[in-house]
UniProtKB/Swiss-Prot annotation:
Belongs to the carotenoid oxygenase family. GO terms for biological process: carotene catabolic process; lutein catabolic process; lycopene catabolic process; retinal metabolic process; xanthophyll catabolic process; zeaxanthin catabolic process. Transmembrane segments: none annotated. It comes from the Eukaryota. Pfam families: RPE65 (PF03055). It catalyses: all-trans-beta-carotene + O2 = beta-ionone + all-trans-10'-apo-beta-carotenal; 5-cis-lycopene + O2 = 5-cis-10'-apo-lycopenal + (3E,5E)-6,10-dimethylundeca-3,5,9-trien-2-one; 13-cis-lycopene + O2 = 13-cis-10'-apo-lycopenal + (3E,5E)-6,10-dimethylundeca-3,5,9-trien-2-one; lutein + O2 = (3R,6R)-hydroxy-alpha-ionone + (3R)-3-hydroxy-10'-apo-beta-carotenal. Its cofactor is Fe(2+). This is Carotenoid-cleaving dioxygenase, mitochondrial. Induction: Up-regulated by lycopene. The lineage of its organism: Eukaryota, Metazoa, Chordata, Craniata, Vertebrata. The gene is BCO2. Its main location: mitochondrion. Its EC number is 1.13.11.-, 1.13.11.71. It comes from Mustela putorius furo (European domestic ferret). Binds 1 Fe(2+) ion per subunit.
């Protein structure tokens, strides 16, 4: 399977891509509810809100952000009730947003943008300000997350903002580091059926950096609680003390947390000195494929790191699809890229290009494909070297013990060749409530024949077939699966996706698909400009 990697790297080269700059441009918020025009129909049982978040403001005064990830968080709400749909949006009133607004310039640095010294200071004061510790942004623009029944918007710093999902107003700013010894946490936690949340976050100290598994209890003891009771249940030392791996998510089964230490490295020295050197934080991230990728497995119940040393060839993953246990193995499904340099491509100057320049950026980015890895949990000294230790007859993924005791893992492709023509897949979603951590069959994602998603895809990982929804000139967001009441089948429900267009003469809309046959049931059009966003969730009423 891995012999086709070079072929994949060349697959999907495209020319004549349409300009998508309007999708990555500042928009106005829509704080007053707007009624959508429904075409087709929304199921009457579909009652609740699709909440989404992403960047919506890319400059303050004359200062402009450099990277897509830097834009100020814009909260979106599509509310559905009895077949009717309404829309509203508000900018997150973070301290960062308010400070930048008051000064009409970028005061607080973001991932790809270094805030410049106050122009009102004299030369000496501006020079000395380079040696001050930079303020950490609370522009939490990546995802909605849930802890103890409350909703927060999150990024990967130590700050989250609790929001009222009805009004989209910020109600409280919460700092992870006030509760546990971490310097941040991902925006992709996992949840047990009882509501217990798990996450991962880094910590940095005199002895280097650690990756920490975090557990947050499912319920509040007192009414005003936020992250009270959170615990670090396991700390994993990074392979390189001053260059830990960057990660965006992790895997979870019923009993295990799976952390992937990938050769996308964060140079802590560069990050610490970024202000002195006049560089953004993103300058400290580098793809180092001379290192292999390593899988760490942690027992959720005991907090113990399993002794197995699992490795594979270098790859980068941003989003896990699902993971489950079978016959003494962890089966881990991921969206993987063989080239970890894609973060650089998502600078705004690249995304806003047109013509041959835009084609060149797209063709330089590695494609993301779904892959399966199998990690045998109970490897002993007596297990033979050079043989596949995976007992799973349904998967061609292998795990081979080497002379040094390490387990070399080779993946199985989960997709048909048709997916290569769709530009790969990202933003994977499953029927999470019923199939997270369990053997499953379907996932949904965006096809990427452009730098943002340009299709919706349903992929059958058992039969390796796919279904596609596409409308030329329109760009759908991450699909969200909503199960139908009482549905017993895995794909019994609907898919929701916000579909936007750079064409100012066309309306953006919320799309609803039948998850089973992937056919459109309806769309709710709104005459509102929206930028392309990141993630979201559906909350039932």
């Amino acid at each position: 399977m891995e012999g086709t990697d070079q072929k994949k790297a060349a697959v999907g080269t495209r020319e004549g891509l349409p300009c998508i700059a309007p999708l990555l441009t500042t928009v106005e918020e829509t704080p007053q509810v707007v009624s959508a025009q429904v075409r087709g129909h929304f199921p009457k049982w579909l009652s609740g809100s699709l909440l989404r978040i992403g960047p919506g403001k890319f400059e303050f005064g004359k200062d402009k952000y450099n990277h897509w990830f830097d834009g100020m968080a814009l909260l979106h709400q599509f509310k559905m009730e009895k077949g009717m749909v309404t829309y509203r949006s508000k900018f997150l009133q973070s301290d960062t947003y308010k400070t930048n607004s008051v000064h009409d310039r970028i005061v607080i640095s973001e991932f790809g943008t270094l805030a410049l010294p106050d122009p009102c200071k004299n030369v000496f004061e501006r020079f000395m300000s380079k040696f001050e510790l930079p303020a950490i942004t609370d522009n939490t623009s990546v995802n909605y997350v849930r802890y103890k029944g409350d909703y927060y918007v999150s990024t990967e710093t130590n700050f989250m903002n609790k929001v009222d999902i009805e009004t989209l107003e910020k109600t409280e700013k919460v700092d992870w580091s006030k509760f546990i010894a971490v310097n941040g946490a991902t925006a992709h936690p996992h949840y047990d059926p009882d509501g217990t949340a798990y996450n991962m976050g880094n910590s940095y100290g005199l002895h280097g950096s650690c990756y920490n598994v975090i557990r947050v209890p499912p319920e509040k003891v007192d009414l005003g609680e936020t992250l009270h009771g959170a615990q670090v249940i396991c700390s994993i030392a990074s392979t390189e003390r001053m260059k830990p791996s960057y990660y965006h998510s992790f895997g979870m089964t019923r009993n295990y947390i799976i952390f992937i230490e990938q050769p996308l490295k964060m140079n802590l020295w560069k990050m610490i000195t970024s202000r002195i050197r006049g560089m953004a934080f993103s300058d400290g991230i580098s793809w180092e494929p001379q290192y292999n990728t390593r899988f760490h497995v942690v027992d959720k119940n005991t907090g113990q790191l399993l002794p197995g040393m699992y490795y594979s060839k270098p790859f980068v993953t941003f989003h896990q699809i699902n993971a489950f246990e079978d016959q003494g193995c962890v089966v881990l499904d991921l969206c993987c890229q063989d080239d970890g340099r894609s973060l650089e491509a998502y600078r705004l100057q690249n995304l806003r290009k047109a013509g041959a320049g835009l084609d060149q950026v797209y063709n330089s980015v590695g494609r993301s494909f779904p892959r399966r890895f199998v990690l045998p949990l109970h490897v002993s000294l007596n297990d033979p070297e050079g043989e596949n230790l995976s007992p799973l007859s349904y998967s061609s993924a292998s795990a081979v013990k080497q002379a040094n005791g390490k387990i070399w893992c080779s993946y199985e492709n989960l997709h048909p060749e048709d997916l290569e023509e769709e530009g790969g897949v990202e933003f994977p979603q499953i029927n999470y409530g019923q199939f997270s951590g369990k053997k499953y069959r379907f996932f949904y994602g965006c096809g990427f024949r452009h730098l943002v998603g340009d299709s919706l895809i349903k992929l059958d990982v058992v039969n390796k077939t796919l279904m596609i929804w596409r409308e030329d000139g329109f760009y759908p967001s991450e699909p969200v699966f909503v199960p139908a009441p009482g549905a017993s089948e895995e794909d019994g429900g609907v898919i929701l996706s916000v579909v936007i267009t750079p064409d100012q003469n066309e309306n953006n809309f919320l799309l609803v698909l039948d998850a089973k046959n992937f056919e459109e049931l309806g769309r709710a059009e709104v005459p509102v400009r929206m930028p392309y966003g990141f993630h979201g969730t559906f909350v039932t009423v």
